[in-house]
Amino acid sequence: MKKKITKEEINELDRYFRLANYLSVGELYLLYNPLLTRPLDIKDIKPNVVGHWGTAPAQNFIYTHLQRIIKKYDLNMIYISGPGHGGQAVVANDYIDGSYAHMYPEFKEGDETSLKKLFKQFSFPGGVGSHVTPEVPGSINEGGELGYSLSHAYGAVLDNPNLIACCVVGDGEAETGPLACSWQLNKLINPETDGIVLPILNLNGYKIANPTILSRIPKDEVIAYFQGMGYKPYLVKGDDPKKMHKLMAETLDEIISYINKIKKESKTHTFRPFYPMIILETPKGWTGPKEVVGTFKSHQVPIIVNKENISNLKILESWLKSYKPEELFNTDGTIKEDIKSFCPPLEKTCGLNPSTNGGIKKELILPENLDKYALKVKRGQTQSEDMRNLGAYIKDVISLNKDNYIICGPDEALSNRLNHVFEATTRKWNTKIIKQDELLGRNGRVIDSILSEHACEGMLEGYLLTGRHGFIHSYEAFVRIIDSMVSQHAKWIKMAKEIPWRKELSSLNILLTSHCWQQDHNGFTHQDPGFINHLLPKKSDTIRIYLPFDTNTLISTFDHISRTKNYINLVVASKHMRPQWLTMEEAIKHCAKGVDELSWASTTNGKTPDIVLACAGDTPTLEVLAAVSILKEKKPELKIKVINVVDLMKLESNDKHPHGLTDKEYDKLFTTNKPILFAFHGYPNVIHELTYNRTNKDMHVRGYIEEGTITTPFDMRVLNKIDRYHLILDIIKYVPKLQKDKSLQEYCVSMLEKHKKHITTYGCDMKEITSWKWN
C-alpha cells in the first residue's frame, strides 16, 4: 500500500520543483537580471540562446523527488541523465543542494552574483556545455550521443551492492539500438552482490520533431513490453504538478520498500526479481509557455527572444514569474532556507556521491613478476597461442581482484582463447540455467553472456567511471560497432583531465583478436582493421595503440596497459598458433622501447643497410621474417635491417605524440636515405600518415587492402600482397642491384603460382608455408 503524502510535503516538493525549473529557464536565456528585480530588457537576454528545454522539467521533477527519498531513507544513490540535452536541469539541482558550490567554490556565496554567473555560463563561450558533461558534479553519462545511459547504470551497480542508480531514459533515446538492448542487462545482476538500477522512462511524447513510438502505442502494450523485459512498471502520469508530486512521492516510497524486500530476500534466496521501473508520462516542455507545452516545438529553445522577436520578451517574463521567484529567493539572491533544508546532507547528494568520481576505487593488484607467465622460447621454432597464454595472466588478475575487475565481450571469451580465465571465475548470469550450460554463475567476472558490443562496452564504461577496472575484448572487425561509443568516452576522458576535481580513472583497455589475418575461415565480412584508423586522430594524451607479435610481448603489453590511468589503450593480438620470437626478458625490453631493431634478424653486420624491413603486428612480422630467411639463403650479400614496432605511436613525431620518437631517434633507426618497406597489420595509409613529416620519404607500405574471402590463412596475405613472396618482389624493385639477377623474381612468381594451384586443389596451404621455421 502506498504511504500517504501530506500537503506540507507536497508544498515542499513543489517549491523545490519550481526553483529548479526557474533556474533551468534562467540558464537557458538570461545574461543579466536573474531575480527579475526590474522588467526584462532585451539586453538581459543572451545574444545567442543555445540549449534545450523539452526534457528539463521532467528531469527536475525526478530530481526533486530523489532529493526527498535520499534524505528520508538515507540512500546511496546516483542520477544518470539519459535524454539528450537538458544539462541545465542537473546543474540547477547541483546548485540548489550545494554540490555545485562544493566543486566550484566561486559559487559558494549563492547570492545574486552567483546566480548571474550560473545563468551566463550555460551554453556560453568559456562556460559549460548544454549536456551533462564531465564538468557537472555527479555525472557519469553526458547524454550527447544517445543510448548509453542504461548500460552505464548497470555497470555502475556491479559489485556496488548498496548503490541505487536512478537512470532517466528519454523515450526518444529508448528507440536507439544500444538502449533497447540494455533493458536486458537486469538478467546479469545479482541483487545480493550488486546494486539496483531504477530506470525511469520519461514518456514526454516527442523527439526533435517526431512523436516517439512508446508514447503512441497503448499503455497496456507498453507495460507488457517492460514486464517481458523483467521489470515491474509503475505508471506516473499527469500534468498537474501538485497531483503529480503526490503520485510520484507515494510511488517512490513503495519502490524503496520493494527494493529493500529484493535486497533482503537475495541473502537467502537465489532468484531473479522483477526490478522496479517508472514510466513517467508528462508533457514535453512541461510548465513552459502554453503555446509549446506538449509539442515537439518545446524540444530546443521554446520561444525565440531577440531583437527581431522582442514581443516574446513578455512571454519569457511571464513564464519565469509563473514559478513565483519571490517565494524561492531571498532579496540577496540566496535560496530560501526551507528549500535548502529540504535537500539531503551534502555528502549524500547525487552530485557528490563518490561513485561518480572514482571514489570507491580500490587500486588494481597485478602480478609482481611476469616470469611466472613467460613462455620459454626457441626463437622461431616454438609454436603457441598468444591469447591462450595471456589468459593465464588474466586468471591471476581476477584472483587478486575478486570484486573490482571485469572482463567484457560479446560471447567471445572462449573463441578469443581466454580459456584459463574460467579456472578462476564464470560468466555472470542470473536467470535460468539448464543442464547443458557451461561456465555460468551469479557472481562471474566475465560479462559475455549478452551479444551486444554496445551493452558490453557500456557496462565496462559504467564500471570504470565508478572507479573500478577491467577490459573489453572483441573480434577486430566487430569492434567497429562501438566506434562512436569509444569516441564519446575519449571525449569524456579529454574533458575530465581538464577538470581539477575529477579523479583519475582506470584506462579503457580494448583487446582485439580474431583479426583480419585470422579470419580466412569466416570471410570478408570479418576482416576490418579500421579501428586503428578510428582511434588515430584522437587526442594524443589519450590514445595508445599496441601491436604485440608473440606471447611474451602480449603479456608485457597487457601488464603495462593495466597499470595506466585515463587512456584508451588498444591492443591487437593473435589467437592462433604462431611462431614465438622473444624471451620474456627480451619482450619487456622491446616493449619498453616500443620500436627497435630485431638485431638477430638483421643481416647488416653493423654496416649500412641496403633496405629497411619494418613490421607491426604478428602476421606482418611473421612474413617479414620469412622473407628475410629466404633472402639470407638466396642473397646472403644483401644487407637488411629489420625493425619491429609494438607501440604504433612511436612512429609519430614526438612533438605530436608523447610516445613519438624524435627525428634524430627515428632517423638513426630507419635511416635518412635507404628504402623502407613496411609490412603493417592494418590499412597502409596509417603508416604513411604517421611518418608523413619524417626525413626519409622512401617509404613503401604493405597492409590490408580490402581483399578477402573464405580462403586459407596464407592466401589472405597473398591477396593483400603482404606475404613473403610479394615482399621480396617489392624489395627487388627498391634495391637496384637485385634487378639484374632475375632468378629471385622468378622464384617468387613460381612460388605464388604454386600456392594458387595448391589451395584450389587441396584447400589448404602448401608445406613450404605450414612447415616453415626460422633459421
Where do the model's predicted regions map?
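Cofactor-/ligand-binding subdomain signature composed of acidic, glycine-rich
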Residues: K2-H52
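N-terminal leader/propeptide and maturation segments of large enzyme subunits in energy/redox metabolism
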Residues: E109, I315-G380, H726-Q739, S743-K754
